Curated annotation (Swiss-Prot):
'Nischarin' means 'slowness of motion' in classic Sanskrit. LRR repeats lie at residues 290-311, 313-334, 335-356, 358-379, 380-401, 405-426. GO terms for molecular function: identical protein binding; integrin binding; phosphatidylinositol binding. Acts either as the functional imidazoline-1 receptor (I1R) candidate or as a membrane-associated mediator of the I1R signaling. Binds numerous imidazoline ligands that induces initiation of cell-signaling cascades triggering to cell survival, growth and migration. Its activation by the agonist rilmenidine induces an increase in phosphorylation of mitogen-activated protein kinases MAPK1 and MAPK3 in rostral ventrolateral medulla (RVLM) neurons that exhibited rilmenidine-evoked hypotension. GO terms for cellular component: cytosol; early endosome; intercellular bridge; microtubule cytoskeleton; nucleoplasm; plasma membrane; recycling endosome. PANTHER family: NISCHARIN (PTHR15454:SF35), NISCHARIN RELATED (PTHR15454). Residues 121-695 are annotated as: Necessary for homooligomerization and targeting to endosomes. It is found in: Cell membrane; Cytoplasm; Early endosome; Recycling endosome. It comes from the Eukaryota. GO terms for biological process: actin cytoskeleton organization; apoptotic process; negative regulation of cell migration; Rac protein signal transduction. This is Nischarin. Keywords: Apoptosis, Cell membrane, Coiled coil, Cytoplasm, Endosome, Leucine-rich repeat, Membrane, Phosphoprotein, Receptor, Repeat.
Amino acid sequence: MAAATLSFGPEREAEPAKEARVVGSELVDTYTVYVIQVTDGNHEWTIKHRYSDFHDLHEKLVAERKIDKSLLPPKKIIGKNSRSLVEKRERDLEVYLQTLLTTFPDVAPRVLAHFLHFHLYEVNGVTAALAEELFEKGEQLLGAGEVFAIRPLQLYAITEQLQQGKPTCASGDAKTDLGHILDFTCRLKYLKVSGTEGPFGTSNIKEQLLPFDLSIFKSLHQVEISHCDAKHIRGLVTSKPTLATMSVRFSATSMKEVLAPEASEFDEWEPEGTATLGGPVTAIIPTWQALTTLDLSHNSICEIDESVKLIPKIEYLDLSHNGLRVVDNLQHLYNLVHLDLSYNKLSSLEGVHTKLGNVKTLNLAGNFLESLSGLHKLYSLVNVDLRDNRIEQLDEVKSIGSLPCLERLTLLNNPLSIIPDYRTKVLSQFGERASEICLDDVATTEKELDTVEVLKAIQKAKDVKSKLSNTEKKAGEDFRLPPAPCIRPGGSPPAAPASASLPQPILSNQGIMFVQEEALASSLSSTDSLPPEDHRPIARACSDSLESIPAGQVASDDLRDVPGAVGGVSPDHAEPEVQVVPGSGQIIFLPFTCIGYTATNQDFIQRLSTLIRQAIERQLPAWIEAANQREEAHGEQGEEEEEEEEEEDVAENRYFEMGPPDAEEEEGSGQGEEDEEDEDEEAEEERLALEWALGADEDFLLEHIRILKVLWCFLIHVQGSIRQFAACLVLTDFGIAVFEIPHQESRGSSQHILSSLRFVFCFPHGDLTEFGFLMPELCLVLKVRHSENTLFIISDAANLHEFHADLRSCFAPQHMAMLCSPILYGSHTTLQEFLRQLLTFYKVAGGSQERSQGCFPVYLVYSDKRMVQTPAGDYSGNIEWASCTLCSAVRRSCCAPSEAVKSAAIPYWLLLTSQHLNVIKADFNPMPNRGTHNCRNRNSFKLSRVPLSTVLLDPTRSCTQPRGAFADGHVLELLVGYRFVTAIFVLPHEKFHFLRVYNQLRASLQDLKTVVISKNPSAKPRNQPAKSRASAEQRLQETPADAPAPAAVPPTASAPAPAEALAPDLAPVQAPGEDRGLTSAEAPAAAEAPAAAEAPAAAEAPAAAEAPAAAEAPAAAEAPAPAEAPAAAEAPAAAEAPAAAEAPAAAEAPASAEAPAPNQAPAPARGPAPARGPAPAGGPAPAEALAQAEVPAQYPSERLIQSTSEENQIPSHLPVCPSLQHIARLRGRAIIDLFHNSIAEVENEELRHLLWSSVVFYQTPGLEVTACVLLSSKAVYFILHDGLRRYFSEPLQDFWHQKNTDYNNSPFHVSQCFVLKLSDLQSVNVGLFDQYFRLTGSSPTQVVTCLTRDSYLTHCFLQHLMLVLSSLERTPSPEPVDKDFYSEFGDKNTGKMENYELIHSSRVKFTYPSEEEVGDLTYIVAQKMADPAKNPALSILLYIQAFQVVTPHLGRGRGPLRPKTLLLTSAEIFLLDEDYIHYPLPEFAKEPPQRDRYRLDDGRRVRDLDRVLMGYYPYPQALTLVFDDTQGHDLMGSVTLDHFGEMPGGPGRVGQGREVQWQVFVPSAESREKLISLLARQWEALCGRELPVELTG
């Protein structure tokens, strides 16, 4: 553009005239917009205005500049949008605008300039707008020191203004004076110039091509330029003395354009201050004296030219995202510390150390580097980023491994980074400094450092061995792994005396789920120091019983699954039966002592290489013969063969072909002949390559067998029959070798296992036809040609993925299409996606929302025997109900098939989700041929889902059962529904991973949970809390023992001394058992591992209890004192209580002090008593409750045992089930044992209080069930009646939940328990007269109301609850706790008490009833009366929760009880239905409940009462109120019209003549006496004589 070529010289052409043309119009809605094109020299831009805009402009110009008023075309009212008018108006408006521009040729008026957008695009307008802006805000910007952003167009306009030589204030407006800009630019320190790509706005101006001058900026310290052309920037060099930071992006093609623009005028130049050598120098250029930071990234710079001589003080240089190919000329930058050369085109670093002397941070990411040899002398390097390069060899890291100052290294996204154990191999290159290196932004872990130490030791041994290789070439061939503690043969090198056993293996992160690394490391290290007897398994009887089972003893019919056990979802699915051959009739598992031996263990690799070489020599003739047979089979194939046989042969030998099989089979016969010729050639090449690569030269084989990966796994080998064994798969560069761990050796030491590895078979890569995942992340499938072998490999996810990736790398990319099976999953599919597909296939509701938390391969052993309980608690012959220990269960499953014991002979998968345990059975039948995969889809898996709440850990396992390495490390006993199941984990550490995940999920469940209650408390069943069991298992694993398998050794067996040390701690736990008569056979039970696991809980309890006892003793002492205060003082005390609620004493005192005694019944004139206090209880009740609530000095204290025994009396009116009856019969310490053995979920939990009550849940508001409420130091447990199970649990129709016919004779009860953790408790609402209380959590599932119907029971529970909460530490609530002044103090002068809310120190809110609630109840009752105006003001005398006895049908006993609220006023008595659970509304409630809080059921006048009958039938102390049903009474006229009608199932009324009977049962004796007393007093006041009270039978 011409504008871009204007020079800055003094001579300039005359300014061209401006033009404005109306080039068109547009119709917008109901008006027309005119398109105007403005031209200013070579600049053009477009604007749009409607006629009204012109009219407004004209009015302002007429007023300000006195132009002709008739110059603008007139308005039109009719036809203003007609085409003819619009065209005429376009011409008139163009003449109007042109006339205005002619009238004001130099500087347009302000309104006209804005109308034509001169302030955006025209030189004078742009400078005027900028000057006005800086006039107003310039000083503020300079004072704040902010970066000022300016556009290239604005700089261009300033430059043009200065070169025109016109007055700085041509418009006459002082605000637009150019001097404001110049004054601002002289003082500005921080500048940012940002251009745009393409035209600016609606103009044709390209900012990046506009020239401008920066010499007007005299004080710049920092400048940032982007999207400009550096060739057109002038004056930047004037800031050399002051500029410290400069950034030029998307603007330059060379460094010289920015740093030395004046150098283009000279042939030779030198920087100022350098000594010349007498050459032809034509110019001396000043240096950038203050520049320390230079950013030239994102430009098009291709070389680092000599202009860098001008920036000698530079410290930070960024040249990233350019096109640099060579690092040059940086030797002049002596102060350079940080250099960024990322994302250039560097391919070599040769000699870079001569140019980068003191660089500390070097970024070379995103280049083409393959070698790092040029960095080996950069001794000052601290941080090097080499990501996204082409570094392949590990040896390249050696170049930087010796740099003394290096701390951070990044090698991500290099070919090097996909090497197995990449991190440890890289870190090993740094030697002793490995701990100081942060690799790939991840700090080095202790585990990695241990691995590095092992690698260093291996490398040192290799170096020593290489020095002796000249004299002992064949020493490695005679190497064998001797069983410990044998001594190495004498021919071994003397330089490695520590090699008498294998080095300590490298343990992967995936292999250790739950166990401390130190314990495992010690178990996998040398075992020579151990005596021989320490190698034998601990549970000798268990091991012998398992290993003595002969092969084939189990019939295949007896090993099939019980119908519906796992495959119950699809019973019609037919499968081809395969003969199941268990390995020697035993349970197979992978021992953990060998999994640490990987491909990095050189001695182990040498052993495997020798075995593989010998196997190849034996199998080589068979492989060559098979290749020849394939060649002959192709030659003998003729045209007379049937098409199906041809297809089979072609499909059998097509593993080098491309494309899917079906597509190629549809091609023509000519193409088929060509394919056969290609196959013949490839088969011949394969055979020749096989003979060459696998020749008889032993030295060649030994030297060239390279082991890529070692995978320890559980293997299912299918070849006509199914065979299972623990295996070691070895992936080499030629094929795969399979080794078996003999089952009888699986319990030995790692030395013994490795020395007894038995070779099974091997096959080259070419024989592999398909491979993929049967289940993603869990089971890898390899299908081998010829022998139709299928290998199902089960291992942990990480090792399987690594093995799969290494196997894929052995094949060319074009061959992978044939090896990927359509019926198997690829590596990209996750377990979560597989679970979603499986649940969708089985149409599980909400299956897409479930997330897998872990999946574990296990054997499942379970019993189906139905036997009755034997006398005296002897369950030794009972299969179903006996302690289902491993030895007995497995022995029966393998040796006694006639007793209907079923065993899963093939592993299942236990998949945990947040709510369910999913049991998955896979089809291990032989894989179908390619092309026939339509018959195999998701129904290859059978699924059974069990709610996680019904799964328990070994609920009845006896603690007398001896344990061992196998049982402790692999066996877990479960109660799933009503079935005992023994899960045998086939992989190491999976049991502890399962326990960890299970405990987390079980603890997070908010629904009902299954608990098991033993019927024989003296037997002390092994049913401790889940976390206690997990910690016990964990302690077994963490024991620092010297045995080869520390996870398997119980403390009593591995270390007798610690067992004796634990005896004093266990004494308090065992003493009560001895008092109950522990026999000599039962005594050792308390000393076994389960009892030891519970010992810390008993030992730590007293110490933990002392602090709460001391802290809350004042509260217990001071609380009874206010109880003696008169009633008149109760209201102020209650009102002031919240102010002191922070102290435990003050918080608990009002709750126990403000209630009147039972004998102080309030008179009607005094008002409702419950409004004054939350806890009306007996006089001595508060003192007794607080005395009982004190934290005992020793747990369990005698007071606690005595109080729980006294409180463990179930009310006679509550319905019970067998499990609750059993609990109610317990006394003394048996209650404490029940809590810890069957109920508690936390290890150090303490029982504090027991309460029997009926409860109502928020989710089932119409159902009231019996519950035993146990308050502990951590939670509130509700053991519920069995009737609630069907409302909360899922349908229980499968195998797991079928009760046996002799279930009632079992030694335990299966019950339901609801747990409300105290940490989830948010508020406690207390009902009127303390008749009930509601516990509210954060969700609807955590809201439950306890209907004690007894103020004393409520009061005791709340006192204990407050005491327990005081010992808990609660984090501050996220909501603001402080209230504003008016809400906190504004209502104190009213004299009325609002809802009494007590904020406990634990942030739990206790809400007590107020006068307002009593007033609401009074109002509701008054509205139901026939004529409220005639009746005196109601005054509630008594409010109690009672039952109305429904008259039973003929021939039946007791009638059912219906919960009712009985209300006694001064003249009436009412029965109401009350909603206890929904009111007051919880915080999470979105809408009001559908039910009203009170619904009046019936009402009678007290004076109509004829007599009161009291008897023991049908319920003890039941009351029958007999009323005279007088005609025309004025109470409840609309409600009681049908008194004499028959109402089947209605309330218990008996209408004989004119009498109506209420049969009322009041559970609380105190409330019952108070009702009779008040009723008699009111009746006497109304009738003038005593109320007749009659006793009946």
